[in-house]
Amino acid sequence: MTHGEPQEFSFDVEENHGHVPVLRARMAELIAPKVTAMGSDAVIIDGTLGAGGHSKYFLESFPEARVIGLDRDTNSLASARERLKEFGDRFLGIHTRFDRFAPKLEELAQSGNPIAATALEQGISGALFDLGVSSMQLDQAERGFAYRVDAPLDMRMDNTIGITAADVLNTYSHGELARILKTYGDERFAGKIASAIVREREKEPFDTSARLVELLYATIPAATRRTGGHPAKRTFQALRIEVNRELESLENVLPEITQRLTTGGRAVFMSYQSLEDKIVKRYFVDISTSKTPPGLPMELPEYAPKFKVVTRGAEKATDAEIEENPRAASVRVRAIEAL
């Protein structure tokens, strides 16, 4: 992925095939050492439960371990619970934004839930965060994530709370719209698009995706449309990130999950665009670097890093994995281990 390039995975439901979890075997391999060593005390957090594919693979691969699945999307959570009911009390599904899981765990532990209690007492053995929008959400056209299907401009991962994409389009100032399009979508025509949105919403508020896509076709120059992919791709990504506060959630969850890892426990993050990957990389570098003041002849224990990066740079999917699952084409994987 080049610098600033947005997510290659299409928001086009016609291009997304099934619900095969990205790099499932590699994810299991990365968290395996401590999960295997902990046996029945191992608790894995699947921070982005979605359709439950990664959780199912973990429950099958580690027959003694238990899994806590987090999702802010009530539809995804209900579907995953049904899919994973064969695993009984080895699986616990929690409705929450992933950076707000800690208070939920504490509440459940206090009420006697054994998985939550073990997670707090023993620490987390492995954690996975598969960032971005899920295949299930893309397949539900009425959610407004996919740009080739006319639908309400919602885009909320948790459709019970928060602002919608329509709210953003109809209420944000020109400057705010231009900022999110440029920052979150790397859209080179951000200012021009923002001007068109403000002009058109004065005639009639935006409420469906087809009207927005039509505006983008009319606003983005033909030469760019011919070579730059679908003209709606960057704008839809930017709106989705803004509506769901995705980067804020990611920045918040990094310290939340790493401080709860047991010694030897690992946290793995799968990013699909450069903004996410930069946040993960920067945090991992910070917590895995010695804080010993320069000039001292030895490493002082109190300044020694408490984590080590497991992956060499950002791992990418193989051609075989991409063929099986097109979503893997732009994935970047980073993992860290508690020392």
Swiss-Prot record:
Subcellular location: Cytoplasm
Gene Ontology cellular-component annotations: cytoplasm
Subcellular location, principal: cytoplasm
Reactions accelerated catalytically: cytidine(1402) in 16S rRNA + S-adenosyl-L-methionine = N(4)-methylcytidine(1402) in 16S rRNA + S-adenosyl-L-homocysteine + H(+)
Protein's UniProt keywords contain Transmembrane helix: no
Keywords: Cytoplasm, Methyltransferase, rRNA processing, S-adenosyl-L-methionine, Transferase
EC number: 2.1.1.199
Alphabetical list of InterPro entries matching this protein: RsmH, SAM-dep_MeTrfase_MraW_recog, SAM-dependent_MTases_sf
Stretches assigned to coiled coil: none
GO molecular function: rRNA (cytosine-N4-)-methyltransferase activity
Binding site for S-adenosyl-L-methionine: G52, G53, H54, D71, F98, D130, Q137
Entry's Gene Ontology BP terms: rRNA base methylation
SUPFAM superfamilies, sorted: Putative methyltransferase TM0872, insert domain (SSF81799), S-adenosyl-L-methionine-dependent methyltransferases (SSF53335)
Enzyme class: transferase
Family recorded in the similarity comment: Belongs to the methyltransferase superfamily. RsmH family.
Function: Specifically methylates the N4 position of cytidine in position 1402 (C1402) of 16S rRNA.
PANTHER family xrefs: 12S RRNA N4-METHYLCYTIDINE METHYLTRANSFERASE, S-ADENOSYL-METHYLTRANSFERASE MRAW
Identification of the protein by name: Ribosomal RNA small subunit methyltransferase H
Species of origin: Corynebacterium diphtheriae (strain ATCC 700971 / NCTC 13129 / Biotype gravis)
Lineage, opening ranks: Bacteria, Bacillati, Actinomycetota, Actinomycetes, Mycobacteriales
